[in-house]
Amino acid sequence: INGDAKGTVFFEQETSEAPVKVTGEVLGLTKGLHGFHVHEFGDNTNGCMSSGPHFNPRSKEHGAPTDENRHLGDLGNIQAAGDSPTAVSITDSKITLFGADSIIGRTVVVHADA
Protein backbone atom coordinates (compact mmCIF):
# COMPACT_ATOMS: atom_id res chain seq x y z
CA ILE A 1 0.00 0.00 0.00
CA ASN A 2 1.49 3.31 -1.08
CA GLY A 3 0.83 6.83 0.19
CA ASP A 4 -0.77 7.47 3.58
CA ALA A 5 -2.66 4.18 3.60
CA LYS A 6 -1.16 1.11 5.23
CA GLY A 7 -2.36 -2.26 6.34
CA THR A 8 -1.98 -6.00 6.51
CA VAL A 9 -3.77 -8.56 4.37
CA PHE A 10 -3.67 -12.35 4.74
CA PHE A 11 -4.36 -14.93 2.02
CA GLU A 12 -5.29 -18.48 3.12
CA GLN A 13 -6.09 -21.54 0.99
CA GLU A 14 -6.46 -25.04 2.46
CA THR A 15 -5.98 -26.98 -0.81
CA SER A 16 -5.39 -26.06 -4.45
CA GLU A 17 -9.11 -26.60 -5.19
CA ALA A 18 -10.38 -24.59 -2.19
CA PRO A 19 -11.32 -20.90 -2.38
CA VAL A 20 -8.87 -18.32 -1.07
CA LYS A 21 -9.88 -16.40 2.05
CA VAL A 22 -8.58 -12.82 2.07
CA THR A 23 -8.74 -11.02 5.41
CA GLY A 24 -7.11 -7.98 6.87
CA GLU A 25 -7.31 -4.30 7.63
CA VAL A 26 -6.33 -1.11 5.81
CA LEU A 27 -5.84 2.24 7.56
CA GLY A 28 -5.85 5.71 6.05
CA LEU A 29 -8.36 5.31 3.22
CA THR A 30 -10.76 8.10 2.32
CA LYS A 31 -14.48 7.41 2.64
CA GLY A 32 -15.95 5.40 -0.22
CA LEU A 33 -15.23 2.43 -2.44
CA HIS A 34 -11.66 1.48 -3.30
CA GLY A 35 -10.63 -1.07 -5.91
CA PHE A 36 -8.79 -4.06 -4.45
CA HIS A 37 -6.63 -5.92 -6.96
CA VAL A 38 -3.67 -8.25 -7.31
CA HIS A 39 -1.20 -6.86 -9.86
CA GLU A 40 1.20 -8.80 -12.04
CA PHE A 41 4.54 -7.98 -10.44
CA GLY A 42 5.80 -7.96 -6.87
CA ASP A 43 7.94 -4.91 -7.68
CA ASN A 44 7.17 -1.81 -5.59
CA THR A 45 10.37 0.13 -6.30
CA ASN A 46 8.34 2.86 -8.02
CA GLY A 47 5.18 2.50 -5.94
CA CYS A 48 2.17 1.06 -7.72
CA MET A 49 3.57 2.10 -11.11
CA SER A 50 6.09 -0.77 -11.05
CA SER A 51 3.51 -3.39 -10.03
CA GLY A 52 2.25 -3.74 -13.61
CA PRO A 53 -1.34 -4.37 -14.72
CA HIS A 54 -3.91 -6.51 -12.95
CA PHE A 55 -2.76 -10.12 -12.73
CA ASN A 56 -4.35 -11.66 -15.84
CA PRO A 57 -2.55 -14.84 -16.98
CA ARG A 58 -5.59 -16.07 -18.95
CA SER A 59 -6.06 -12.85 -21.00
CA LYS A 60 -9.60 -12.22 -19.77
CA GLU A 61 -11.55 -8.93 -19.69
CA HIS A 62 -11.74 -6.72 -16.61
CA GLY A 63 -14.73 -7.78 -14.53
CA ALA A 64 -16.42 -8.10 -11.18
CA PRO A 65 -15.36 -10.82 -8.73
CA THR A 66 -18.43 -12.91 -9.58
CA ASP A 67 -17.91 -12.68 -13.37
CA GLU A 68 -16.67 -15.79 -15.15
CA ASN A 69 -14.72 -13.57 -17.59
CA ARG A 70 -12.40 -11.48 -15.40
CA HIS A 71 -8.77 -10.87 -14.59
CA LEU A 72 -7.65 -13.22 -11.82
CA GLY A 73 -6.51 -10.12 -9.94
CA ASP A 74 -9.97 -8.47 -9.96
CA LEU A 75 -11.07 -8.85 -6.34
CA GLY A 76 -13.70 -6.10 -6.32
CA ASN A 77 -13.93 -3.16 -3.96
CA ILE A 78 -13.55 -2.50 -0.27
CA GLN A 79 -15.77 0.07 1.47
CA ALA A 80 -13.98 2.60 3.67
CA ALA A 81 -15.82 4.64 6.30
CA GLY A 82 -13.03 7.22 6.25
CA ASP A 83 -12.58 7.51 10.02
CA SER A 84 -11.75 3.95 11.04
CA PRO A 85 -9.82 0.92 9.81
CA THR A 86 -11.28 -0.70 6.70
CA ALA A 87 -11.86 -4.42 7.09
CA VAL A 88 -11.01 -6.73 4.21
CA SER A 89 -13.02 -9.95 4.05
CA ILE A 90 -13.18 -11.66 0.66
CA THR A 91 -13.57 -15.29 -0.37
CA ASP A 92 -12.54 -15.90 -3.97
CA SER A 93 -12.62 -19.14 -5.97
CA LYS A 94 -10.57 -17.91 -8.95
CA ILE A 95 -7.28 -16.85 -7.36
CA THR A 96 -4.91 -19.48 -6.04
CA LEU A 97 -1.83 -19.82 -3.89
CA PHE A 98 -0.73 -22.91 -5.86
CA GLY A 99 0.82 -23.54 -9.28
CA ALA A 100 1.60 -21.32 -12.25
CA ASP A 101 -1.33 -18.93 -11.60
CA SER A 102 -0.40 -18.35 -7.95
CA ILE A 103 -0.69 -14.81 -6.62
CA ILE A 104 2.23 -15.36 -4.23
CA GLY A 105 4.95 -12.75 -4.78
CA ARG A 106 2.63 -10.29 -6.52
CA THR A 107 1.52 -6.83 -5.38
CA VAL A 108 -1.87 -6.05 -3.84
CA VAL A 109 -3.05 -2.57 -4.87
CA VAL A 110 -5.80 -0.59 -3.16
CA HIS A 111 -6.90 1.99 -5.72
CA ALA A 112 -7.85 5.51 -4.64
CA ASP A 113 -11.37 5.30 -6.09
CA ALA A 114 -13.50 2.48 -7.43
Swiss-Prot record:
Region (Disordered): 48-76
Lineage of origin: Eukaryota, Metazoa, Ecdysozoa, Arthropoda, Hexapoda
Gene coding for it: Sod1
UniProt xrefs under InterPro entries: SOD-like_Cu/Zn_dom_sf, SOD_Cu/Zn_/chaperone, SOD_Cu/Zn_BS, SOD_Cu_Zn_dom
One of the record's GO molecular function terms: superoxide dismutase activity
Protein name per the record: Superoxide dismutase [Cu-Zn]
Cofactor note (record): Binds 1 copper ion per subunit.
A single cellular component GO annotation: cytoplasm
Family annotation (CDD domains): Cu-Zn_Superoxide_Dismutase
